[in-house]
Amino acid sequence: GILAAIAIPQFSAYKNRAYQSDAKANLHNIFLACKALWADKSGTDDCTTDLITGADYGFVASTNVTVNITSAKEANFAATSIHTSDASNTTYTMDENGNITP
């Protein structure tokens, strides 16, 4: 009983940290795929998930992770991600420099 009272909340917190790491990793991966697209297109094209998903640029979102590109130009790129299983419902944002917040 006592062990379960300690272990179960810790396990839940551990799972949430893993979900949050997955959401951040998806932002990093979409940023790298967009960088490759912009290198191919001289930085002028919008980066969309349709363009970077698949063999050419390799982006594939993880299961249960929603990633949205909110600003598709290289100069002011922004994207968000959230893992649907994360109990804290934390939405992460990446800017044009690759910085992730929160």
Which residue ranges define each predicted feature?
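Amphipathic alpha-helical segments typified by the pilin-like N-terminal helix
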Residues: 1-25
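Periplasmic/extracellular, small/polar-rich flexible segments of pilin-like filament-forming proteins
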Residues: 32-102
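Alpha-helical assembly-interface signal, strongest on the long, hydrophobic N-terminal helix that forms
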Residues: 16-40
